[in-house]
């Protein structure tokens, strides 16, 4: 249509009016378009469209009509015939439009109005149509939602009905079961009653049986006691009868012997011998090996001392000689000296054996006792033997002990010395005497502990520890019998033949009226008791050097220091040996190694005594005060202890002391031997020349034996004299083939060996068994002798009859110095013995690792035989060499020698494995050529015969050691408290063998993890081997093998139970896997295992914390600072985040640090911006929000969170809160369900208004004395140590363990002391101690770290806490603030720091005292002396009101050693002071202030005039009380180390609380009570006060700020005297009206 465009254009100018008027018009017509249906709307629309089209037609018609009318009006009245009209037309056409007037305006205006109205109606209808369409769409949508809700409602209703049916069924079942259970309960109750009745009956029966059993037991005990008593009586009777039988037999034998001797005497007298009558008896010299000197007058009395050896009988043999015998004549005042030998000193009746030569077993070579010293008046004392007045009756001991022992009579068995192998030639005993004579002599000689001595005196001896019954009864009868028999037997000059001394028998004692002979007893460990009447032991095996060659003589200890009291006890082999009385008569001397002048000298005229010292193995012997032989140190393990060991200085000596000797008639044990020379060589003769000349010329027939004795004893003087004689055969060998050089070398007498070698003695002469002197010296470990012999070209590869070389013997006895010398000399290591053993076999057989290392690694020098000049460097060099052995050194022995088999097919590995010598086996296994699979003749490998430990070692011989490490993943950097946590820790090394399967490998990994988790969570330092673990149970921290997320072998991932084609051994070698890494499950997997391992917080507790966060949404972690609150909150948030993300919810962590400037508005913005707080009209999103508020302690909880308490408790729209926006508008918000809030507070407890917030949150308290914090530090440091030691747990005595335990104790003690002081704000969590350095061998680093921690963290916190507490209740204007503390407050702080430092930190430090003192200065407050402090004086009576405390500020110097100022502190009172005046410090005007120094400079407390300390603070008083109790606490460690010296320690005053002051002044003239401090050396402080005033008024003493001691019971008068006489104290009587004192009130 032509009018479409015009008709459809709306007229917007009138639209608002029509729109406003439309509702009114619609309302008038009651026509509501909104109520029309869709079809009606369509009908209406079509009608309106038709109307519009009709209107268009009408408009067009009207326009056409208008045009016609216009033309008619304008041109109708004109025609062409009228020119006037044409002109008028033109005129009208040319005029302007404005001037023209419409011809007809009325119809057009009407049409335009109609058209405008139509346009408006069209626009209105289009708007209504659009609104109707939108409403229709909304209606359809709501209908669809309604239908969905109806369906859901139907489902829920159906489900509800179903649940109701199920619940009904369950209820019915429960009712039925309840009925059944009630019936069962009744039945069980009846049964229980029956059982209880039966139980009562059984109890009655049991009690009756117990009574009967007790009665029977009592009867049996009584019967057993009776039996024991009878048996004891039987034993006693048997011993008495046996002793009586032996006495009778001995008596009979002695009488027979006397008859035979008398017959021989008569025959000799008839022959007309020219010997003096009564002085010398004939004797055979052909078969004798003893020197006999017969004496007359009181009967020939002799003393004999021999040596007992240990019970080791391996190298012993039957008797081959008897020692040198010298009968002596006792004189009054000169009792004989019994020379004790090592072990039990056995003797024959008429024989004194000064020159005993024998071979002792291993135990005789073990000497480790220190020489004790008798007083100068003491006579000679030997090793285990008694001094004068006490005969030796000592049992054998593996360790020689000085004879400073009490005369205890004890008989402990030991083999007789002469039944042992004796390498020196000696003639057999006299063959004609009955062996029973010998037993009789041992029976009656010296068996009583209290027999009278020669002077008639009695030496008291304590009861013996092991005395046979014979020594307890019939003392008189025994004495008579002993005297009679001994007098008869002692007349004979030769010892009885074939009767070796019986074990346990005492040496020969003197008879008649001689003093009692005390016997000392030294228990032998492991020795079985042998009764006195038993026969001698069975002779041992044949001689040989397969065991340690023993010195052919007894061993006796030389007493080195004559200044020490002889009453000291010596501890040897766990047996205490008491010392004898020092009342020793004259006639004997004490031998000193270095100088004879140190010992007591004889007090009688020169009467020669015979003393041939037989020194074993290089012990010093003093001969003629000129000879000295050094004892060289050598280390010999086990029973093969070298006799020349530096620990043993032993001189075996047999001494015969006589008052009269006639050398001209003395005959030697060998024909022609000179007794005078023996006397001279003994070193006891005052005059040498007369004695040498008195005997006249003597033949040299017996000199070789004397030469051997001198060489064996180490008597350099005698040896040099003998070597200077002509015609002497220095290479003479005794029956066993032992030469003088052999004896000297075997006993380690280096000087004697040098003399003999210089005299051209044969160096390679061998004995009957083929052993050379070098063999003997090497076996005994005398490396100096070995060095000399090698220098003189001794055959270092000489093999004995059994094939033993010197190197073999040295290895057999573990003498590593000798081994080293021989190896450097180029000895052959491959020489084999008769049974196929090499030196390596010998070293392994004894388990000596050092010897084996030398054999395998020590290289001989290129230039051959080179001897060291300094043997003292041997041990150091050996240690260096052992270190090289551990490193890159290669063994020098070939594989054939290592794998050499003996006659039975055993290699060295077989021997080490079978004996369990794991260390030796490890050394052998280091040799690349070892064949552990080699089999012996029984087809057994070393593994077959090995012990368990050695089997494990052999199984792991070729194993690959792969470290197993635990990783917790990457720890995010940040301030979460995880700075000290380690990402990886080595827990152990896995041994992967060729036969290891993947199952075995998987089990090993699981077991290693389980062991490690349980080891780090255990309480003590126990190694993994000492702990029994259960692989199935979790550790106390909750970790197990199931906590593993993944395992990587090198870089290849692997899971438990997984198998590869290659074996683990091949897999590790192929892939070059250097380690096995175990990654624990962490927060990324929604687990907390890695958090547990990193922080050592038990897994169960972390899971509980996570449950609290998920359940309550609002959790706050609070505890002391450093309790890992931030770390725990962050890790829980990470775990919760990944759990939510795994469930399909997006999650975000928001972290905010709260400080003092953090306001509530900032917190609101934080919540709103992160969609925690959302408007009430807005629906929550699916996103989870976790908010962490850190450091809430820095702000007020009530102010910060007060408005959020309700909304946080209810996460819903039911608890909205209104907040204003920045533009001033307010809106309601609420916390939605997907919001979690966690907070951290570094505060031990809440105070004040913060408690109002407590009930609205879930609180997790991390107490320092409760889990998880209590054990966290211990577990963390323990794991740190295990990681440092590569998975091994060190022993508890390791310095690292002690250091870690000290650091742990410091943390606990610090918190304990701070808790006692009532300063919880100073408590410390374990975080600060996690960085404790673990450096093995460097405990100083830990102490330095502790000092830095103390200065940077602990001390400032303690100072702040104590100052805040001391001033918390101080009145304003009277006290000092913490920013400007007074001197008194500073004193309290310094005292507290000093007490804490000494009681909690320095106490228990593993450093030595000297090292600790060097580090003490590094600690702040460590040098504060507690002695220089002020204390409160007691208030004077009747002057309580406004009492003033006067403190003298002028320190005085002490007059003693110490100069430390002390204080005079009288209490002053002033009349007129108000009653509410608080006690203050005031200073005297006259006090000099010029000499004052600060506390920091002179460590003395000086209180200035301007600084006054208010004492009215209750908290301050309580603090001082706590300091006082901590100082005085016995349960705490000693704090005496706080002060500069012990005298400086001041105890805290134990007075009561602050007194209540009265305003009444009764006696203003009364002198003040004051407290005086006495000089520091007096250990007490004087107190002068009026006791009456205290009792009358009951005024309690004001508590002292710092510890000042007071005497417990000091009287006023005494104190007054002390104080008046003291140079550093004053007593001032002060008048209340004194003008010098002007108390002021601030």
Swiss-Prot record:
Record PROSITE patterns: ANK_REP_REGION (PS50297), ANK_REPEAT (PS50088)
Chain positions covered by the region annotation Disordered: 1-27, 203-222, 366-433, 446-471, 491-611, 1440-1469, 1546-1642
Protein name, entry field: Cortactin-binding protein 2
A cellular component term, taken from the record's GO annotations: dendritic spine
Functional summary from the UniProt entry: Regulates the dendritic spine distribution of CTTN/cortactin in hippocampal neurons, and thus controls dendritic spinogenesis and dendritic spine maintenance. Associates with the striatin-interacting phosphatase and kinase (STRIPAK) core complex to regulate dendritic spine distribution of the STRIPAK complex in hippocampal neurons.
Entry's Gene Ontology molecular function annotations: protein phosphatase 2A binding
Positions of post-translational Asymmetric dimethylarginine modification: 491
């Amino acid at each position: 249509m032509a009018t479409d465009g015009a008709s459809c254009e709306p007229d917007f100018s009138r639209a608002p009016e029509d729109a406003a008027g439309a509702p009114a018009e619609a309302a008038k017509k009651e026509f509501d378009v909104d109520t029309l249906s869709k079809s009606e709307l369509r009908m209406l629309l079509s009608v309106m469209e038709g109307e519009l089209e009709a209107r268009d037609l009408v408009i067009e018609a009207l326009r056409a009509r208008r045009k016609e009318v216009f033309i008619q009006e304008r041109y109708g009245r004109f025609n062409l015939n009228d020119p006037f009209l044409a002109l008028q037309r033109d005129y009208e056409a040319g005029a302007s439009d404005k001037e023209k007037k419409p011809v007809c305006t009325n119809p057009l205006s009407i049409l335009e109005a109609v058209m405008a109205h139509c346009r408006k109606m069209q626009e209105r209808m289009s708007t209504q149509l659009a609104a109707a369409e939108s409403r229709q769409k909304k209606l359809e949508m709501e209908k669809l939602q309604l239908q969905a809700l109806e369906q859901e409602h139907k489902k829920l209703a159906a489900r509800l009905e179903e649940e109701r049916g199920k619940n009904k069924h369950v209820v019915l079942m429960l009712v039925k079961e309840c009925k059944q259970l009630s019936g069962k309960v009744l039945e069980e109750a009846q049964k229980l009653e029956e059982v209880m009745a039966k139980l009562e009956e059984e109890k009655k029966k049991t009690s009756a049986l117990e009574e009967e059993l007790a009665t029977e037991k009592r009867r049996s005990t009584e019967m057993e006691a009776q039996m024991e008593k009878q048996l004891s009586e039987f034993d006693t009777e048997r011993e008495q009868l046996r002793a009586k039988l032996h006495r009778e037999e001995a008596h009979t034998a002695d009488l027979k012997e006397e008859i035979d001797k008398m017959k021989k005497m008569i025959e000799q007298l008839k022959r007309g011998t020219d010997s003096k009558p009564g002085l010398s008896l004939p004797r055979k010299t052909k078969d004798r090996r003893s020197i006999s000197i017969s004496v007359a007058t009181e009967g020939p009395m002799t003393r004999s001392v021999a040596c007992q050896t240990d019970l080791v009988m391996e190298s012993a043999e039957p008797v081959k000689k008897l020692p040198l015998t010298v009968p002596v004549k006792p004189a009054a005042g000169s009792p004989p000296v019994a020379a004790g030998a090592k072990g039990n000193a056995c003797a024959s009746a008429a024989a004194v054996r000064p020159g005993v030569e024998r071979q002792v077993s291993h135990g005789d070579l073990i000497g480790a006792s220190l020489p004790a010293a008798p007083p100068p008046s003491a006579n000679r004392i030997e090793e285990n033997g008694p001094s004068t007045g006490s005969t030796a009756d000592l049992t054998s001991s593996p360790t020689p002990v000085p004879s400073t022992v009490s005369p205890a009579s004890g008989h402990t068995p030991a083999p007789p010395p002469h039944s042992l192998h004796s390498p020196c030639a000696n003639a057999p005993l006299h063959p004609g005497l009955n062996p029973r004579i010998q037993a009789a002599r041992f029976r009656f000689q010296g068996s009583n502990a209290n027999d009278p001595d020669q002077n008639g005196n009695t030496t008291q001896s304590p009861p013996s520890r092991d005395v046979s019954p014979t020594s307890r009864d019939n003392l008189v009868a025994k004495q008579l019998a002993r005297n009679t028999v001994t007098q008869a037997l002692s007349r004979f000059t030769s010892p009885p033949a074939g009767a070796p001394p019986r074990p346990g028998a005492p040496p020969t004692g003197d008879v008649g009226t001689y003093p009692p002979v005390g016997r000392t007893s030294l228990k032998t460990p492991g020795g079985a008791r042998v009764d006195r009447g038993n026969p001698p032991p069975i002779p041992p095996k044949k001689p040989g050097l397969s065991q340690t060659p023993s010195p052919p003589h007894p061993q006796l200890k030389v007493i080195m220091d004559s200044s020490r009291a002889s009453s000291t006890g010596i501890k040897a082999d766990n047996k205490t040996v008491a010392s004898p009385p020092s009342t020793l008569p004259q006639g004997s001397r004490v031998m000193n190694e270095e100088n004879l002048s140190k010992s007591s000298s004889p007090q009688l005229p020169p009467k020669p005594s015979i003393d041939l010292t037989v020194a074993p193995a290089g012990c010093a012997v003093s001969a003629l005060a000129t000879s000295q032989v050094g004892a060289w140190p050598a280390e010999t393990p086990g029973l093969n202890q070298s006799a020349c060991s530096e620990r043993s200085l032993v001189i075996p000596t047999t001494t015969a002391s006589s008052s009269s000797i006639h050398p001209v008639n003395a005959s030697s044990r060998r024909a022609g031997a000179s007794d005078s020379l023996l006397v001279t060589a003994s070193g006891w003769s005052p005059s040498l020349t007369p004695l040498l000349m008195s005997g006249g010329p003597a033949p040299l027939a017996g000199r070789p034996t004397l030469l051997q004795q001198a060489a064996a004893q180490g008597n350099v003087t005698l040896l040099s004299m003998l070597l200077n004689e002509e015609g002497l055969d220095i290479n003479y060998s005794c029956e066993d083939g032992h030469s003088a050089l052999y004896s000297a070398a075997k006993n380690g007498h280096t000087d004697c060996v040098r003399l003999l070698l210089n005299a051209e003695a044969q160096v390679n002469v061998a004995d009957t068994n083929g052993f050379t002197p070098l063999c003997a010296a090497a076996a005994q470990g005398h490396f100096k002798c070995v060095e000399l012999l090698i220098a003189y070209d001794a055959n270092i590869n000489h093999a004995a009859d059994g094939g033993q070389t010197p190197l073999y013997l040295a290895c057999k006895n573990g003498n590593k110095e000798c081994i080293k010398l021989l190896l450097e000399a180029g000895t052959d290591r491959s020489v084999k013995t008769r049974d196929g053993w090499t030196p390596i076999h010998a070293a392994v057989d004894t388990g000596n690792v050092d010897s084996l290392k030398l054999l395998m690694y020590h290289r001989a020098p290129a230039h051959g035989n080179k001897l060291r000049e300094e043997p003292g460097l041997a041990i150091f060099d050996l240690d260096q060499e052992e270190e090289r052995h551990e490193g890159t050194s290669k063994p020098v022995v070939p594989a054939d020698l290592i794998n050499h088999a003996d006659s039975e097919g055993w290699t060295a590995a077989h021997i080490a494995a079978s004996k369990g010598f794991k260390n030796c086996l490890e050394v052998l296994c280091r040799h690349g050529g070892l064949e552990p699979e080699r089999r012996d003749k029984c087809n057994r490998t070393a593994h077959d015969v090995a012990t368990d430990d050695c089997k494990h070692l052999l199984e792991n011989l070729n194993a690959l050691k792969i470290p197993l490490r635990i990783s917790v993943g990457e720890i995010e950097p940040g301030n979460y408290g995880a700075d000290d946590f380690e990402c990886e820790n080595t827990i152990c090394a896995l041994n992967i063998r060729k036969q290891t399967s993947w199952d075995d490998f998987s089990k090993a990994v699981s077991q290693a993890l389980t062991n490690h988790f349980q080891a780090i969570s255990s309480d003590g330092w126990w190694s993994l081997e000492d702990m029994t673990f259960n692989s199935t149970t979790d550790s106390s921290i909750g970790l197990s093998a199931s906590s593993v997320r993944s395992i990587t072998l090198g870089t290849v991932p692997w899971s438990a139970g997984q198998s590869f084609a290659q074996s683990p051994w091949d897999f590790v070698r192929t892939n070059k896997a250097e380690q096995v890494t175990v990654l624990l499950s962490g927060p990324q997997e929604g687990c907390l295992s890695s958090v547990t391992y990193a922080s050592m917080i038990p897994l169960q507790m972390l899971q509980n914390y996570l449950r609290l966060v998920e359940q309550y949404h609002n959790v706050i972690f609070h505890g002391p600072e450093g309790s890992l609150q931030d770390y725990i909150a962050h890790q829980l948030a990470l775990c919760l985040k990944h759990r939510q993300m795994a469930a399909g919810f997006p999650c975000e962590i928001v972290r905010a640090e709260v400080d003092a400037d953090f306001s509530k508005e900032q917190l609101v913005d934080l919540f709103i911006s992160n969609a925690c707080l959302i408007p009430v009209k807005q629906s929550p999103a699916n996103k989870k929000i976790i908010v962490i508020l850190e450091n809430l302690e820095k702000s007020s909880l009530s102010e910060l969170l007060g408005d959020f308490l309700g909304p946080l408790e209810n996460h819903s729209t039911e608890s909205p809160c209104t907040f204003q926006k920045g533009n001033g508008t307010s809106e309601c918000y609420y916390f939605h369900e997907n919001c979690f809030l966690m907070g951290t507070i570094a505060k031990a407890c809440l105070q004040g208004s913060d408690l109002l917030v407590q009930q609205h949150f879930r609180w997790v308290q991390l107490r320092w004395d409760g889990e998880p914090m209590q054990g966290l530090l211990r577990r963390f440091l323990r794991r740190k140590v295990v990681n440092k030691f590569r998975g091994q747990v060190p022993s508890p005595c390791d310095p690292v363990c002690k250091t870690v335990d000290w650091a742990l104790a410091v943390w606990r003690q610090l918190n304990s002391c701070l808790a006692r002081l009532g300063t919880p704000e100073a408590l410390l969590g374990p975080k600060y101690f996690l960085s404790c350095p673990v450096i093995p061998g460097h405990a100083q680093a830990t102490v330095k770290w502790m000092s830095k921690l103390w200065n940077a963290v602990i001390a400032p916190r303690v100072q702040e806490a104590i100052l805040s507490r001391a001033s918390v209740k101080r009145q304003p204007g009277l006290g000092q603030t913490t920013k400007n503390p007074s001197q008194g407050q500073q004193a309290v702080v310094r005292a507290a720091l000093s007490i804490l430092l000494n009681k909690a930190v320095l106490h228990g430090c593993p450093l030595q005292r000297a090292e600790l003192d060097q580090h003490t200065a590094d600690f702040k407050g460590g040098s504060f002396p507690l002695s220089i402090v002020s204390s409160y004086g007691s208030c004077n009576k009747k002057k309580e009101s406004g009492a003033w405390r006067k403190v003298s500020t002028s320190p005085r110097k002490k007059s003693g050693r110490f100069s430390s100022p002390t204080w005079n502190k009288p209490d002053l009172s002033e009349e007129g002071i108000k009653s509410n005046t608080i006690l203050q410090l005031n200073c005297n005007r006259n006090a000099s202030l010029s000499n004052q120094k600060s506390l920091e400079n002179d460590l003395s407390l000086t209180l200035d005039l301007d600084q006054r300390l208010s004492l009215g603070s209750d908290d301050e008083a309580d603090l001082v009380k706590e300091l006082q109790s901590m100082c005085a606490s016995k349960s705490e460690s000693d704090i005496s180390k706080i002060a500069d010296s012990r005298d400086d320690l001041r105890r805290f005053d134990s007075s009561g609380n602050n007194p209540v002051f009265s305003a009444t002044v009764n006696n203003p003239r009364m002198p003040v009570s004051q407290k005086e401090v006495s000089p520091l050396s007096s250990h007490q402080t004087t107190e002068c006060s009026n006791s009456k005033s205290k009792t009358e008024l009951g005024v309690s003493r004001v508590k002292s700020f710092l510890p000042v001691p007071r005497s417990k019971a000091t009287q006023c008068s005494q104190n007054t005297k002390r104080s008046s006489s003291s140079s550093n104290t004053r007593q001032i009587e002060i008048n209340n009206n004194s003008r010098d004192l002007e108390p002021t009130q601030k």
